[in-house]
UniProtKB/Swiss-Prot annotation:
Gene3D superfamilies: 1.20.120.1490. The gene is cpxP. This is Periplasmic protein CpxP. It comes from Escherichia coli (strain K12). GO terms for cellular component: outer membrane-bounded periplasmic space. GO terms for biological process: regulation of proteolysis; response to stress. The lineage of its organism: Bacteria, Pseudomonadati, Pseudomonadota, Gammaproteobacteria, Enterobacterales.
């Protein structure tokens, strides 16, 4: 259930980000989501990697192809979920079915993007791949630190709440 909820929230966040980006964006050649997709993939995955101009062009081509092949976010599914959430009578089974449907669509998009990232990774030299893998390990360590901090903060909060109530 947590996975379904997370996927639904991610989809909702993506759509709201895209709608905001569409309002802010200008220019005839701007495609909603293009900047967001490019920034999220390149700023995280390829930070600290020096790419040749040829590699950059190949990656741009892969991203452009992926954008055109990827199905858009299904706005009607989000509208359906909104109607279920705001309904007079809450129907858990209907919400669960809708959430699973939306989660499956999100999974399909993530798999497609993983394929593109794999193709981009294979464009790198062995040295660039080593740098990328090192950067990844550093990010994972940072995430572990944050997770550990969150756990310890939650435990402190719980223990201080228990001592006050006694």
């Amino acid at each position: 259930m947590r996975i379904v909820t997370a996927a639904v929230m991610a989809s909702t966040l993506a759509v709201s980000s895209l709608s905001h980006a569409a309002e802010v964006g200008s220019g005839d050649n701007w495609h909603p989501g293009e900047e967001l997709t490019q920034r999220s993939t390149q700023s995280h995955m390829f930070d600290g990697i020096s790419l040749t101009e040829h590699q950059r062009q190949q990656m741009r081509d892969l991203m452009q192809q992926a954008r055109h092949e990827q199905p858009p976010v299904n706005v009607s599914e989000l509208e359906t979920m909104h109607r279920l959430v705001t309904a007079e009578n809450f129907d858990e089974n209907a919400v669960r079915a809708q959430a699973e449907k939306m989660a499956n669509e999100q999974i399909a998009r993530q798999v497609e993007m993983a394929k593109v990232r794999n193709q981009m990774y294979r464009l790198l030299t062995p040295e660039q791949q080593a740098v990328l893998n090192e950067k990844h390990q550093q990010r994972m360590e940072q995430l572990r630190d944050v997770t550990q901090w969150q756990k310890s903060s939650s435990l402190k909060l719980l223990s201080s709440s228990n001592s006050r109530s006694q």
